[in-house]
Amino acid sequence: MSQNTLFDKVWDLHKVSSLPGGSDQIFIGLHLIHEVTSPQAFGALKDKNLKVKFPSRTVATVDHIVPTDNQSRPFKDNLAEQMIETLENNCLQHKIKFFNIGSGNQGIVHVVAPELGLTQPGMTIACGDSHTSTHGAFGSIAFGIGTSQVRDVLATQTIAMNKLKVRQIWCENNLSNGVYAKDLVLHIINELGVKAGVGFAYEFAGPAIDELSMEERMTICNMSIEGGARCGYINPDEKTFSYIKNRLYAPKHTQWDKALLWWKSLKSDENSIYDDVIKLDASKVEPTVTWGITPGQSLGINQLIPLLDDLPPNDQFIAEEAFEYMGFMPGQSIKDTPVDVCFIGSCTNGRISDLRVAAKILKDKKVSKKVKAFVVPGSEKVATEAKEEGLDKIFKDSGFQWREPGCSMCLAMNSDKLIGNQVSASSSNRNFKGRQGSPSGRTLLMSPAMVAAAAINGKVSDVREFINK
C-alpha cells in the first residue's frame, strides 16, 4: 500500500532524471515571470542565442515596481518604465502570454495566476519570487527561484533541486471569531521559528485548514518561506475544485472531467510517512501581531513582548537587535502601539476576501487623523470586483486611499514607502529592517482586519472589539 505524501507524488511525476551529486532534474509545468527577476534571464538567453523552450508554459505580468498612484505611461519612474518595457519586448519576441496594465488581468503574480485558473493541483510551479509557495494552496508544488534558475526554466523548462523532506503541520480545532489565516500562519512561524523549515516542504492539514477558504489557504502557503520552508502545500479538496471551475484557463467540458478525476487522486495517502509532524491547537490562536524584525517575532494581541531570559539562547541576539531597532522593551504590551501608516494589500492579503473583511470593519467609521492609510488591490480583477461591491467607496469614505494593483509597500520598490521612523500596520509578509522603504521604518505584520482596526484607532487594536460590538 502506498505511503506517499502529495509532495512525493508530484515530485516523482515531474522528475526528469537524477543528477550527479544527489539532486534531481525537475520539469516545471508553469513558469510565472514578472518585470524584476526576468530581464537578466532573457539577456542570458540572448547571449547564447537560445529561445524559450515552451512559451505556452510561461505567463507574465507586472507587479513589483509598477506605480499604484498613477499608471499612465510613460511612468514618472524611468526605471519602472524601462523594466516594464523590457518585459513587454521579451514577451513579444518569445510569444509569451503577458497580462499588462489595462488588460483586466494584471496584478501581483501570485494573485493573478490562481484567479485565472492557471494554478492547478499536481503542478510544479516556479517563479522568480520568494512567495511562489502561495500556489501550494491548490495542491501544487511551487518554488521561488533565483534569476539564474529563471534562465534555466526559460531555456529548458527544468530546474535542478535536492528533494525536500516533508513536515506535516496539523492544525487541530478551528479558529475563533475575529482570528484569521494570517494570525494562524504568524502563530505557526512563531512556534516553529524562521529557520525550522530549511530543507522541508510544509504540508498544512487538519480541521482548521479544511475550514479555510481557498484565499485563506493561499495566505497560509504564501508565508511558508517565512518559516524557512522551500514550499508549502495543502491537499486539494472540493473547495479547491469549486474555486478553479469555470475560470478562464481551467479545463473545460470533457477535459474538466478528466482533470477532476486526476486531481482527486492527488492527496497524501492516509498512512503517509512524514519526516516530522507538528500539532497545533488553532482554537488557542489570538489576533497576532509581529513586534520584531522577523515574521517569527510575533505574539497574540493580549500577550506581552517576551523577556530575553524567556527566549531560547539562539533567539536572544536577534531579539536584542529587534528591541533596539523597533524601540520596544521586553515585557511591553504590543496593544495600543501608535501607528503612522496602515497598508492593506500584497500577495499575502490583497485578495477580494481580504478587502471584504477589512471593509466590514471600516464601514461607517473614519481613519484616525494621525494615520495615512491605503489599500492596494492584488489585481485588476480584484479591483473590479471590489468596485462592483462598493468596497472602494467604503474604503475611500473611511479615509483610505484607493490605489491601483501592484506589490506596493510590501517591498517599496515604487514610491509607496515609509518615511523616517514611521510605524506601519501592514497586511504584508515581511518585517525586515528597511523592508518598507525607509532604513529606519518599522513594520508590524497583522491581518487586514487588524490593519483596519489600527487605522480607525490610530494604534494597534484588538479587532474583536469591533466585531463583537
Swiss-Prot record:
The cofactor note reads:
Binds 1 [4Fe-4S] cluster per subunit.
Entry-linked PROSITE patterns: ACONITASE_1 (PS00450), ACONITASE_2 (PS01244)
Q: Which cofactor does it need?
A: [4Fe-4S] cluster
**Which domain of life does this protein belong to?**
Bacteria
EC number from the UniProt entry: 4.2.1.33
Segments of this protein annotated with the region Disordered: 424-443
The broad enzyme category this protein falls into is lyase
Swiss-Prot/TrEMBL catalytic activity: (2R,3S)-3-isopropylmalate = (2S)-2-isopropylmalate
| Free-text function comment from the UniProt entry | Catalyzes the isomerization between 2-isopropylmalate and 3-isopropylmalate, via the formation of 2-isopropylmaleate.
Q: Which family does it belong to?
A: Belongs to the aconitase/IPM isomerase family. LeuC type 1 subfamily.
Q: How is this protein named in the record?
A: 3-isopropylmalate dehydratase large subunit
Q: Which organism is it from?
A: Prochlorococcus marinus (strain MIT 9312)
| Organismal lineage | Bacteria, Bacillati, Cyanobacteriota, Cyanophyceae, Synechococcales
